[in-house]
UniProtKB/Swiss-Prot annotation:
Enzyme Commission number(s) from the entry: 5.6.1.7
Family: Belongs to the chaperonin (HSP60) family.
Subcellular location: Cytoplasm
An annotated Gene Ontology molecular function: ATP-dependent protein folding chaperone
Annotated catalysed reactions: ATP + H2O + a folded polypeptide = ADP + phosphate + an unfolded polypeptide
Biological process terms in GO annotation: protein refolding
Top-rank lineage group of the source organism: Bacteria
GO (cellular component) term, any one: cytoplasm
UniProt KW keywords: ATP-binding, Chaperone, Cytoplasm, Isomerase, Nucleotide-binding
Organism: Pseudothermotoga lettingae (strain ATCC BAA-301 / DSM 14385 / NBRC 107922 / TMO) (Thermotoga lettingae)
Source lineage: Bacteria, Thermotogati, Thermotogota, Thermotogae, Thermotogales
Protein name as it appears in the record: Chaperonin GroEL
Annotated function: Together with its co-chaperonin GroES, plays an essential role in assisting protein folding. The GroEL-GroES system forms a nano-cage that allows encapsulation of the non-native substrate proteins and provides a physical environment optimized to promote and accelerate protein folding.
UniProt binding sites for ATP: 29-32, 86-90, 413, 479-481, 495
Subunit-structure text: Forms a cylinder of 14 subunits composed of two heptameric rings stacked back-to-back. Interacts with the co-chaperonin GroES.
Length: 539
């Protein structure tokens, strides 16, 4: 395939044009008065959004050289979104400002490598400033504020705060479509897994077709149970206590199943059998989770424990177990809280190490079940277009809230970025030549988000920046929604520190790469050949 090449200044100008086209489409969405963008879809209704990364992802330019610049900005937005879940528009605005200033200096004869070095040094100091100024979340109200700002809706903020309140920081919160127009939170407490009773004869509530066992003993094994002889000693021990038993095994069949069913029907021993959740190694891990949650032991040949030797202490305990046709819920497991914490920490470190998204989701789900439950935010809307947009905002707000829990919060509205210029001023004193010019590029870019927020709300950015910098209060800023100056923390205008920091670092990374680019290589478009003339009709 033949290639087209473009060099030096011409190459960088093409990249800049592509960057500007994407950034101009994205930056109008910044802040509480940001505008919407309507995106055509090849099928179905168009999407209306003010989410930076969604807009950037949709843009593909006709000019192949310009498109390379557009792809670089997309990279800034999606990388920030992947790491922090929000801040994509801020990252794009910062990147555009750095690239514009940087290219001016390269055209004037500055050394791009030294400029990049200056940009990196200034960014490092500003990012450290942001991290140091972060304040830990102090409760439900802070969580609601962070989520409300990300989603641009206090109603969504309250929903996310309610969900986090119920499941804790490590809990799983999922977003699903609601069957009504309402948006609400549904909560499932305890550990739930998708395996139901093996036989309907175990049912204790015929109306609901479910089994409810109060304060049961729980036998957990990875074996297939078919013979009854190995089971008899443990069943006799449980029968003497007068409590019910739940058997979780690879499978229960034949004599073993018949014995459990007959004991249940005769009223000798209330029992229920379910298959173990998952497959292969995942099954082993989930059985171990259940054992730790309930304070039991997994009866396994690998551990050298035989069913005949099982003591009552090897069985798990819980307050209530509910078993339906397709799922089982264990509520109030009696496991050692310290052991449960250790297991959660172990799963957390596995999440950090894994690169597979599917694996990550599965591990998070396991962690949530150990932590005590799953919250589902059911999203309702009048039209499909509104539903898609609302769902997307909630998912974004959830990610931003998790980022805030992780690294803390800083004053929002671009205030922290402009205040971080103090840290860059210290770097400027140490540098000279083109490195100093590079640091100055970052210094100027740090005011771009606040300027854009003001302009989107119909105010003069320069006037607002001057007024904010005149105040010594670090959290003093401009509330663009109400059009007044205020303490950002008190007004609840806060951003997760991780979002602000990631936006700056990703913008600087792409700007540095673009400034040091000398050559562009793209595929030459194929020339469309004229179609052959139609055959003359036959007579």
């Amino acid at each position: 395939m033949p290639k087209l090449l473009r060099f030096d200044e011409e190459a960088r100008r093409s990249l800049e044009k592509g960057v500007n086209k994407v950034a101009d489409a994205v930056r109008i969405t910044l802040g509480p008065k940001g505008r919407n963008v309507v995106i055509e879809k090849s099928w179905g209704s168009p999407t209306i959004t003010n989410d930076g990364v969604s807009i950037a992802k949709e843009i593909e330019l006709e000019d192949k050289f310009e498109n390379l610049g557009a792809q670089l900005v997309k990279e800034v937005a999606s990388k920030t979104n992947d790491v922090a879940g929000d801040g994509t528009t801020t990252a794009t605005v910062l990147a555009q400002s750095m690239i514009r200033e940087g290219l001016k200096n390269v055209a004037a004869g500055s050394n791009p490598i030294l400029l990049k070095r200056g940009i990196d040094k200034a960014t490092e100091k500003a990012a450290k400033y942001i991290k140091d100024k972060a304040k830990k979340l102090s409760g439900r109200e802070d969580i609601a504020h962070v989520a409300a700002i990300s989603a641009n809706s206090s109603e969504i903020g309250d929903l996310i705060a309610e969900a986090m309140d119920k499941v804790g920081e490590d809990g799983v919160i999922t977003v699903e479509d609601s069957k009504t127009l309402e948006t609400y939170v549904e909560f499932t407490e305890g550990m739930q897994f998708d395996r139901g009773y093996i036989s309907p004869y175990f049912v204790t509530d015929a109306e609901k077709m479910e089994v409810e066992l109060k304060e049961p003993f729980i036998l957990i094994t990875d074996k297939k149970l078919s013979a009854v002889k190995p089971l008899i000693p443990v069943l006799e021990k449980v029968a003497q206590t007068g409590k019910p038993i739940l058997v979780i095994a690879e499978d229960v069949e034949g004599e073993a199943l018949t014995t459990l069913v007959l004991n249940k029907l005769k009223g000798t021993l209330s029992a229920c059998a379910v298959k173990a959740p998952g497959f292969g190694d995942r099954r082993k891990a989930m059985l171990q989770d259940i054992a730790i949650l309930t304070g039991g032991t997994v009866i396994s040949d690998e551990l050298g424990i035989n069913l005949e030797d099982v003591a009552i202490e090897d069985l798990g305990r819980a307050d209530i177990v509910r078993v339906k046709k397709d799922d089982t819920i264990i509520i109030g497991g009696k496991g050692n809280p310290e052991e449960i914490k250790k297991r959660i920490a172990q799963i957390k470190s596995q999440i950090e190490q894994t690169t597979s998204e599917y694996e990550k989701e599965t591990l998070q789900e396991r962690m949530a079940k150990l932590a005590g439950g799953v919250a589902v935010i059911k999203v309702g809307a009048a039209t499909e277009t509104e539903l898609k947009e609302k769902k997307h905002r909630i998912e974004d707000a959830l990610s931003a809230t998790r980022a805030a829990v992780e690294e803390g919060i800083v004053p929002g509205g671009g205030v922290t970025l402009i205040r971080s210029r103090k840290a860059v001023e210290d770097v400027l004193k140490e540098l000279d030549g083109d490195e100093k010019v590079g640091a100055m590029i970052v210094y100027k870019a740090l005011e771009a988000p606040i300027r854009q927020i003001a302009e989107n709300a119909g105010y003069d950015g320069a006037v607002i920046i001057e007024k904010i910098l005149a105040s010594k209060e670090e959290s003093y800023g401009f509330d663009a929604l109400k059009g007044e100056y205020t303490d950002m923390f008190k007004a609840g205008i806060i951003d997760p520190a991780k979002v602000t920091r990631s936006a700056l670092q990703n913008a600087a990374s792409i700007a540095g790469m673009l400034l040091t680019t000398e050559v562009l290589v793209v595929e030459k478009p194929e020339e469309k050949k004229e179609a052959a003339p139609a055959m003359p009709p036959e007579y």
